[in-house]
From Swiss-Prot:
It comes from Salmonella paratyphi B (strain ATCC BAA-1250 / SPB7). Keywords: 4Fe-4S, Iron, Iron-sulfur, Metal-binding, Methyltransferase, rRNA processing, S-adenosyl-L-methionine, Transferase. CDD domains: AdoMet_MTases. It is an enzyme of class 2 (transferase). This is 23S rRNA (uracil(747)-C(5))-methyltransferase RlmC. Catalyzes the formation of 5-methyl-uridine at position 747 (m5U747) in 23S rRNA. The keyword Zinc does not apply. The lineage of its organism: Bacteria, Pseudomonadati, Pseudomonadota, Gammaproteobacteria, Enterobacterales. Gene3D superfamilies: 2.40.50.1070, Vaccinia Virus protein VP39.
């Protein structure tokens, strides 16, 4: 992939950009083999790749510069701003949004936050697009509610310029730290969620719910999990760290009993909405801590699917799963190192199959899906 920002030495986020996609995939596959060394794997499935550019459905932009000439992108450690509007990871549909937002910021009087001086209001712009219908969600991350009245007054102009903006919010992040969002979310539109659709499964995206940033590869990840579960004798399943329910909603059947657990209430609201649309009455989603939920249960499902953050599921949950001994475990991970550590804490399980998904091209990161079967 050619990138003018990289060539000019202004951005180094895509550290592997000089390697071909095939070289990157080979290196990631070798890394996964290294991490799983000593753990018998019955079947290595072929790795799954995707587009090398224009694949991201989300932009996270630091806002700097002045109210008359705002700049969207990132700040180097020395405070130097870099404009990332031309980043080739973003789809072409983002460019007109960035172009319209620059004069809008002046109209609304949203002074960019100055980190060194601790002054200003607008810290970040967070833009998300639905691949399904092109609808977009825009979040203004502000230091306070001081400019809310001006922001509301200027919105009709912005919405006339960009009718694809379906969900607009103001997120309040008052802390002087590099934290992307705060707890308070103020909706500025009637619509509060974007609809996405993977493999004919409706998925909803709300402001504070996690959603994969590479929809092409994510849809294949979910479809693969559905295929694997469909080949197993599963009548009762847990989906832990379930997010908006992508895995559970793909794997569930009308006859299956499924419980999805996620600590973020916004994500659970999305999952419940999708389950209702699909008419799946035996799916139950709850906003709880996944480890605490599992340890408190007295029943054993046929299969437990886990999709934890980068830190993995941790030894307490591993120990409980080993004790509870479901017949199958599916582990989806964005950090194969912690996944390998966790699997080593499950000595009575064997890896039946594993597959790599190149969710993050031009970086060392990747997603991996592993099916574990109880051996005794």
């Amino acid at each position: 992939m050619q990138c003018a920002l990289y060539d000019a030495g202004r951005c180094r986020s895509c550290q592997w950009i000089t390697q071909s996609v095939n070289e990157q995939l080979s290196a990631k596959t070798a890394d996964l083999h290294r991490l799983l060394a000593g753990l018998p794997v019955e079947q290595w499935c072929a790795p799954i790749g995707g587009p090398e550019q224009h694949f991201r459905n989300k932009a996270k932009m630091v806002v700097s510069g002045s109210v008359e000439k705002p700049l969207f992108g990132m700040l180097h450690r020395d405070g130097t701003p870099v404009d990332l509007c031309g980043c080739p990871l973003y789809p072409a549909s983002f460019a007109p949004v960035f172009s319209a937002l620059k004069p809008f910021i002046a109209r609304a009087g949203l002074t960019p936050y100055n980190v060194a001086r601790k002054r200003g209001e607008l810290k970040y712009l967070l833009l998300t697009e639905s691949q399904f219908d092109g609808g977009m969600m825009l979040r203004f991350v502000l230091r306070s509610e001081t400019k809310l009245t001006q922001l509301r007054a200027a919105l009709p102009w912005l919405r006339a310029q960009l009718p694809q903006l379906r969900v607009i919010t103001a997120n309040i992040q008052p802390v002087h730290m590099a934290i992307m969002e705060g707890e308070t979310e103020i909706y500025l539109t009637d619509q509060q969620a974007l609809v996405e659709r993977f493999n004919d499964v409706p998925l909803w995206i709300r402001p504070q719910s996690f959603f994969q940033t590479n929809p092409t590869v994510a849809s294949r990840l979910y479809a693969t999990a559905r295929d694997w579960v469909g080949q197993l004798p599963v009548r009762h399943m847990w989906d832990l760290f379930c997010g908006v329910g992508g895995f559970g909603l793909h794997c569930a059947t009308p006859q299956m009993q499924l419980t999805g657990i996620e600590i973020a209430p916004e994500a659970i609201a999305c999952a419940k909405q999708s389950a209702a649309e699909l008419g799946l009455t035996r799916l139950h989603f709850q906003a709880l801590d996944s480890t605490q939920f599992a340890i408190a249960q007295g029943e054993t499902p046929d299969l437990v699917l886990v999709n934890p953050p980068r830190r993995g599921i941790g030894k307490p949950l591993c120990d409980y799963l080993a004790q509870m001994a479901p017949r199958f475990i599916i582990y989806s991970s964005c950090n194969a190192q912690t996944m390998a550590q966790d699997i080593r804490h499950l000595p009575n399980y064997r890896i039946q199959r594993v597959q790599l998904f190149d969710m993050f091209p031009h970086t060392a990161h990747y997603e991996v899906l592993a099916l574990l079967r109880r051996s005794i």
